[in-house]
Amino acid sequence: MINRKHQKGTMESRRNRRKQNKEKKGGLLIFFIIGIIGTIGGFVFNAMLNKQDIDEATNCPTDGVNYHKVILIDTSQSYNPIQKEWIKNQLKKIVYGTKENEKISVYTVGANYHETLLPLQSKCNPGDASGVNPFLENKRMKQEDWENEFIKPLNSVFKGLLDNDSEGLSPIMEMVQAISIAAFQNEKTSTKRELFIFSDMIQNSEVASHY
């Protein structure tokens, strides 16, 4: 004879175990979801906490940069195709070797350097899509900003300078001295400074000439 009471008790026991297992799994799932939300929240909070104030015109941190590269291109001379290609490659290395929030300023040698000594372009690298935080930024938009706000403005200036006809006077020594003061004087003490000069370094000014 089948013990129906025993069968009934066994079935109820199984149902209870299934119920307990479901409750455990549900609890673990809730804990896992809460853990993910907490982790994401931590990333977002940390990113917002460490976010720097950025100047919209230059893309540079308002409290200063850690590295400032100044490029001086001598337009008093004409460059042949081979020279242009070499200079373009060097400029590309400088630009693409510039890290996020580091600054590049471009100057040219001119006869009227003492009247106005402003960079033709001065931009900080806003960072490309490779360093995007997916919780805070859009990868495609970040890449477009990097190209439109950093790469294209600099390339446009470089092209204009290298394609220009020679301007005659080349006060290169005065320009190097003036730029060393004008470009770097407002930087933080801790800012690394570097000056790149593209010139034949032949002085040709009203004061002195090596021709």
Where are the language model's segments positioned?
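Well-ordered, non-membrane alpha-helical segments in soluble/globular domains
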Residues: 84-92, 172-178, 211
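Acidic, polar low-complexity linker/tail segments
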Residues: 13-84, 96
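DG-centered beta-turn motif at the end of beta-strands
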Residues: 74-75, 179, 192-206
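Von Willebrand factor
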Residues: 64-190, 194-195
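N-terminal intrinsically disordered, acidic low-complexity segments at the extreme N-terminus
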Residues: 1-15
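VWA/integrin I-like adhesion module and closely mimicked acidic/polar interface patches used
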Residues: 45, 202-211
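Surface-exposed acidic, glycine-flexible loop patches that form ligand/cofactor-binding
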Residues: 60-63, 95-98, 182-189
